[in-house]
Curated annotation (Swiss-Prot):
Record keywords, A-Z: ATP-binding, Cytoplasm, Fatty acid biosynthesis, Fatty acid metabolism, Lipid biosynthesis, Lipid metabolism, Nucleotide-binding, Transferase
Known pathway: Lipid metabolism; malonyl-CoA biosynthesis; malonyl-CoA from acetyl-CoA: step 1/1
A single GO cellular-component term on record: acetyl-CoA carboxylase complex
Localization per record: Cytoplasm
Annotated CoA carboxyltransferase C-terminal domain residues: 43-297
The protein's name in its UniProt record: Acetyl-coenzyme A carboxylase carboxyl transferase subunit alpha
Native source species: Vesicomyosocius okutanii subsp. Calyptogena okutanii (strain HA)
InterPro entries named among the record's database cross-references: Acetyl_CoA_COase_a_su, ClpP/crotonase-like_dom_sf, COA_CT_C
GO molecular function, one term: carboxyl- or carbamoyltransferase activity
Length: 322
């Protein structure tokens, strides 16, 4: 089993391995055999693309949840240098310390200064420890708020990348006021007089995501998720069985398609065929195009209108008809 592929991707992995094997022997083959190998590679690639389209056309919510956490999926730091022209990182909350799980600083997008804030997970063991598996502590959210206030002062739009399983639930974080830090961000962002765009690039977990996700435009990548609890957490509470995470995922309606339908998000960013991990370069281009387009659109609105629209959006969440 290829560990770079999820269970439902294994048929694709088998074809890709065959393609790689043929590609490796192509250089050693004579002219006649090389032409034959090239034709076989073309046929296998065509078969792989067709199979990928078939599999990804009918993904379950649980399979999309797995894609959102794919080990090869791009994280916040992977995007910065390609999406933004410049980036200068700023550190610390000026109260307790610097939380590495929150990356923030001044960036330029299409020659427009913006304040960028994003959640970072980590790929290697050392990185996961450094970034606390993408679970911010109170000082991370207070750093984010400090940067947002700085953006307000200099009339800069704010761009946030959401990718977290949730806020860190450790004793130290609770002692330092985790819930207060999240609540303060929700309160301040709801009336912050500057444009805000949030993008869920992977996993949007509960209040830990919301704390940098109150925005005028909320976007999600096609195979990202956004919910009040993880499928595993929901399954352990509702079904007393974590193995029923697939059922919980269906109930949570956590995918971009469901959330767009419920008007909880505004824009779905299409992913390359097979997901972001199959074509990272194309994913970066797609994100930059949509982000630039939405930023130019939102900048045209007067601040008063922007705040009215934001308030209307927030107050509209949770409404239902009997």
């Amino acid at each position: 089993m290829n560990l770079d592929y999820l269970d439902f991707e294994q048929p694709i992995a088998e074809l890709e391995e065959k393609i790689q094997t043929l590609d490796n022997i192509k250089g050693k083959a004579n002219i006649k055999d090389k032409a034959d190998i090239i034709n076989k590679i073309k046929a296998l690639k065509s078969k792989s693309n067709a199979l990928t389209k078939k599999i990804f056309s009918s993904l379950s919510d649980w399979q999309i949840s797995q894609l959102a956490r794919h080990p090869k999926r791009l994280y916040t730091l992977d995007y910065i240098s390609d999406v933004f022209d410049e980036f200068t990182e700023l550190h610390g909350d000026r109260t307790y310390g610097d939380d590495h799980a929150i990356i923030g600083g001044i960036a330029t997008l299409d020659n427009q200064p913006v304040m960028f804030i994003g959640q970072q997970k980590g790929r290697t063991t050392q990185e996961k420890i450094k970034y606390n598996f993408g679970m911010p502590r109170p000082e991370g959210y207070r750093k984010a708020l400090r940067l947002m206030k700085l953006a307000e002062k200099f009339s800069m739009p704010i761009v946030t990348f959401i990718d977290t399983p949730g806020a860190y639930p450790g004793i130290g974080a609770e002692e330092r006021g985790q819930s207060e830090a999240i609540a303060k961000n929700l309160f301040e962002m709801s009336t912050l007089p500057t444009p805000i765009i949030s993008i869920v690039i992977g996993e949007g977990g509960s209040g830990g995501a919301l704390a940098i996700g109150v925005a005028d435009i909320i976007m999600m990548f096609e195979y990202s998720i956004y919910s009040v609890i993880s499928p595993e957490g929901c399954a352990s509470i509702l079904y007393k069985d974590v193995t029923k995470a697939n059922l919980a995922a269906e109930s949570l309606k956590l995918t971009s398609i469901h959330l767009k339908k419920e008007r909880l998000i505004d824009v779905v960013i299409n992913e390359p065929l097979g997901g972001i991990h199959r074509n990272p370069s194309q994913a970066k281009v797609l994100l930059k195009e949509v982000l630039t387009q939405q930023l130019n659109k939102i900048k045209q609105l007067p601040i008063e209108q922007l705040l009215q629209n934001r308030q209307k959006k927030l107050l509209g969440f949770g409404k239902f008809k009997d």
